[in-house]
Swiss-Prot record:
Reaction(s) this enzyme catalyzes, per UniProt: (2R)-O-phospho-3-sulfolactate + H2O = (2R)-3-sulfolactate + phosphate
Highest taxon, organism lineage: Bacteria
Natural source organism: Thermotoga maritima (strain ATCC 43589 / DSM 3109 / JCM 10099 / NBRC 100826 / MSB8)
Listed InterPro entries: ComB-like, ComB-like_sf
SUPFAM superfamilies the record matches: ComB-like (SSF142823)
Pfam families: 2-ph_phosp
Gene transcribed to yield this protein: comB
UniProt-recorded name of the protein: Probable 2-phosphosulfolactate phosphatase
Keyword entries, A-Z: Hydrolase, Magnesium
PANTHER family registered for this protein in UniProt: 2-PHOSPHOSULFOLACTATE PHOSPHATASE-RELATED (PTHR37311:SF1)
Similarity annotation: Belongs to the ComB family.
Length: 227
């Protein structure tokens, strides 16, 4: 079965979990690894992140969309350029994305974004029990995450869909332009734009910029190798 859940309050279980935080955690994870970071370690708190600071490690993330004091990078994927992060380990803490990972009980967890949409779909074609876990925004529904979930469901072309997957697919089918839909109607996107992050919206809604699939292995996101 394929299903979709939004901002779960309690632990969720499945065999293959796909974590989605379009704006911006999973887009940043995909970008960082695609640009040469050796791994991305998601953590819940700022304090936990700062405790991991050492040579070769970059402390990154945001609270309320802004880079915390003492951090090397924020949560804008545009900051994660090859010359800054190649060969480095990224420790990442964010308001939504890294928090929801803690609630997933799964044999495997991968990170999805519009940036690696086709690669994620290709990887999932061989999987049976799939749960698309949308991070949401501050525990609430997030339009952009649901839209990406619908895009994944649509491309998988499966018949065994849960109610959440059906709804996400229907929503995706009703949208003519995903970028414009997000910019016009996503409250989180509007807030980021008001804070000066409009370029992030443009970047995070770009499809298939990367052909990579980050997977969480022993607490670290690394690039998943598959045929």
């Amino acid at each position: 079965m394929v299903d979709v859940v939004m901002a779960p309050c309690s632990p969720v279980e499945c065999r293959t979990a796909v974590v989605i935080d379009v704006l911006r955690a999973t887009s940043t994870i995909v970008t960082a690894l695609s640009n040469g970071a050796s791994g991305v370690i998601p953590v819940k708190t700022i304090e936990e992140a700062l405790e991991k600071k050492k040579e070769g490690v970059l402390i990154c993330g945001e609270r309320n969309a802004q880079k915390p004091k003492g951090f090397n990078l924020g949560n804008s994927p545009l900051e994660y350029r090859k010359e800054k992060i190649s060969g480095k380990t990224i420790v990442l803490t964010t308001t939504n994305g890294t928090q929801v990972i803690e609630k997933i009980r799964s044999e495997e967890i991968i990170a999805a974004s519009f940036l690696n949409l086709s690669a994620v779909v290709e990887y999932l074609k061989s999987k049976e029990d799939i749960l698309l876990v949308c991070a949401g925004t501050n525990g609430r529904f997030s339009l952009e995450d649901f839209l990406l979930a619908g895009a994944i469901v649509k491309r998988l072309k499966r018949n065994d869909l849960g109610d959440g997957a059906h709804a996400a697919e229907r929503y995706f089918e009703s949208v003519e332009n995903t970028r414009e839909e997000i910019k016009k109607h996503s409250s989180h996107a509007k807030r980021l734009i008001s804070l000066g992050f409009e370029n992030d919206i443009e970047f995070c809604t770009t499809e298939d910029l990367f052909k990579t699939v980050p997977a969480l292995v022993n607490g670290v996101f690394i690039l998943k190798e598959f045929p």
